[in-house]
Amino acid sequence: MLKVIAEQEHYLLISDGQRFTVVERRAGKFYPLCTGVRHGLDLGDETIAELISRSGSYSERDAQRRLTEVASQWRELFEHVR
């Protein structure tokens, strides 16, 4: 079952109950954090496996750290170009 655990800026820490990952939310779609072409997906129980597979699976602690890191990088970039 999909669970949103935390949210910072445009990023969410999500879990399927066993695995954790961070995804980006833009324009109502959710994107894995990976290199290459990324296609937006609807967030749901049926898409969480693909998001975790493409974004990487982490322990909850490591995923929380990744969320903080990615959101901080986004904020720094936003402040720089603003």
Residue map of PLM features:
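Generic intrinsically disordered, low-complexity segments enriched for polar/acidic and small residues
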Residues: 8, 17, 27-28, 55, ...
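Negatively charged, low-complexity tracts enriched in Asp/Glu with abundant Ser/Thr
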Residues: 1-14, 76-80
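A structural microfeature
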Residues: 6, 23, 34-36
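Short linear proline/tyrosine/threonine-rich motifs used for host-factor recruitment
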Residues: 12-14, 20-24, 30-32
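Mixed-charge, Lys/Arg-enriched low-complexity segments
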Residues: 35-82
